[in-house]
Protein backbone atom coordinates (compact mmCIF):
# COMPACT_ATOMS: atom_id res chain seq x y z
CA UNK A 1 0.00 0.00 0.00
CA UNK A 2 1.29 3.45 -0.86
CA UNK A 3 1.96 5.64 2.12
CA UNK A 4 0.15 8.89 1.47
CA UNK A 5 -1.50 11.69 3.37
CA UNK A 6 -3.83 14.42 2.19
CA UNK A 7 -1.05 16.71 0.92
CA UNK A 8 -0.66 16.44 -2.87
CA UNK A 9 3.12 16.48 -2.45
CA UNK A 10 2.89 13.05 -0.80
CA UNK A 11 2.33 11.54 -4.27
CA UNK A 12 5.20 13.38 -5.99
CA UNK A 13 7.76 10.96 -7.39
CA UNK A 14 5.42 7.97 -7.14
CA UNK A 15 4.17 5.79 -9.99
CA UNK A 16 0.82 4.00 -10.09
CA UNK A 17 -0.87 1.51 -12.40
CA UNK A 18 -4.61 2.03 -12.82
CA UNK A 19 -6.14 -1.28 -13.84
CA UNK A 20 -9.35 -1.01 -15.86
CA UNK A 21 -9.48 -4.54 -17.24
CA UNK A 22 -7.19 -4.76 -20.26
CA UNK A 23 -6.57 -0.99 -20.19
CA UNK A 24 -3.84 -0.25 -17.61
CA UNK A 25 -2.48 3.29 -17.79
CA UNK A 26 0.60 4.10 -15.73
CA UNK A 27 0.72 7.48 -13.99
CA UNK A 28 3.83 9.09 -12.54
CA UNK A 29 3.27 12.19 -10.42
CA UNK A 30 6.14 14.54 -11.29
CA UNK A 31 4.78 17.46 -9.24
CA UNK A 32 1.37 18.61 -7.98
CA UNK A 33 0.92 20.21 -11.42
CA UNK A 34 2.68 17.77 -13.77
CA UNK A 35 1.95 14.13 -14.60
CA UNK A 36 3.49 11.53 -16.90
CA UNK A 37 0.84 9.36 -18.58
CA UNK A 38 1.81 6.06 -20.23
CA UNK A 39 -0.77 3.78 -21.85
CA UNK A 40 -1.41 1.48 -24.76
CA UNK A 41 -4.79 1.65 -26.49
CA UNK A 42 -4.91 -0.85 -29.34
CA UNK A 43 -1.99 0.00 -31.60
CA UNK A 44 -1.64 3.49 -30.09
CA UNK A 45 0.99 4.09 -27.44
CA UNK A 46 0.81 7.16 -25.23
CA UNK A 47 3.80 8.48 -23.30
CA UNK A 48 3.44 12.15 -22.51
CA UNK A 49 3.92 14.68 -19.75
CA UNK A 50 0.80 16.78 -19.14
CA UNK A 51 -0.25 19.61 -16.88
CA UNK A 52 -2.42 18.33 -14.04
CA UNK A 53 -4.28 19.42 -10.93
CA UNK A 54 -3.95 17.30 -7.80
CA UNK A 55 -6.02 17.90 -4.67
CA UNK A 56 -5.95 16.03 -1.38
CA UNK A 57 -9.40 15.32 0.05
CA UNK A 58 -8.42 13.32 3.13
CA UNK A 59 -5.49 11.05 3.96
CA UNK A 60 -5.11 8.59 1.08
CA UNK A 61 -7.88 10.16 -1.07
CA UNK A 62 -7.05 12.45 -4.00
CA UNK A 63 -8.76 14.06 -6.98
CA UNK A 64 -6.61 14.51 -10.07
CA UNK A 65 -7.40 15.91 -13.51
CA UNK A 66 -5.50 16.49 -16.71
CA UNK A 67 -5.91 17.05 -20.44
CA UNK A 68 -3.96 14.80 -22.78
CA UNK A 69 -2.29 16.13 -25.93
CA UNK A 70 -4.92 14.35 -28.05
CA UNK A 71 -7.70 16.30 -26.31
CA UNK A 72 -8.99 13.74 -23.79
CA UNK A 73 -9.96 15.38 -20.47
CA UNK A 74 -9.62 13.01 -17.51
CA UNK A 75 -10.73 13.28 -13.88
CA UNK A 76 -9.80 10.59 -11.36
CA UNK A 77 -10.77 10.01 -7.76
CA UNK A 78 -7.92 7.95 -6.32
CA UNK A 79 -8.47 6.10 -3.02
CA UNK A 80 -5.00 4.79 -2.21
CA UNK A 81 -6.02 3.33 1.16
CA UNK A 82 -8.62 1.06 -0.49
CA UNK A 83 -6.69 0.72 -3.80
CA UNK A 84 -9.67 1.95 -5.86
CA UNK A 85 -9.67 4.49 -8.69
CA UNK A 86 -12.70 6.08 -10.34
CA UNK A 87 -11.98 7.41 -13.85
CA UNK A 88 -14.19 9.92 -15.65
CA UNK A 89 -13.04 11.02 -19.10
CA UNK A 90 -14.47 13.15 -21.88
CA UNK A 91 -12.68 11.81 -24.95
CA UNK A 92 -11.59 14.08 -27.77
CA UNK A 93 -14.34 12.69 -30.01
CA UNK A 94 -17.02 13.59 -27.44
CA UNK A 95 -17.54 10.13 -25.96
CA UNK A 96 -17.59 9.69 -22.20
CA UNK A 97 -15.50 6.93 -20.59
CA UNK A 98 -16.42 6.21 -16.95
CA UNK A 99 -14.91 3.20 -15.19
CA UNK A 100 -13.82 2.00 -11.77
CA UNK A 101 -10.68 -0.03 -11.26
CA UNK A 102 -7.76 -0.80 -9.01
CA UNK A 103 -4.81 1.49 -8.31
CA UNK A 104 -1.48 -0.02 -7.33
CA UNK A 105 1.82 1.64 -6.50
CA UNK A 106 4.69 0.57 -8.76
CA UNK A 107 8.21 0.23 -7.41
CA UNK A 108 10.53 2.00 -9.85
Locations of the language-model features?
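Short beta-strand segments that buttress and anchor functional surface loops
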Residues: 15-21, 37-41, 63-68, 87-90
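Beta-sheet ligand-binding and adhesion/scaffold domains
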Residues: 65-108
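Tryptophan-anchored aromatic micro-motifs
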Residues: 2-24
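Long, compositionally biased, intrinsically disordered segments
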Residues: 6-9, 22, 32-37, 87, ...
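N-terminal glycine/threonine-rich, aromatic-flanked beta-hairpin/loop signature
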Residues: 25-55, 91
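Short, solvent-exposed coil/turn segments at beta-strand boundaries
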Residues: 11-12, 28-36, 57-60, 77-84
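Contiguous, well-ordered beta-strand patches that form the walls/edges
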Residues: 43-78
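Polar, enzyme-active/binding microenvironments
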Residues: 17, 25, 31, 83, ...
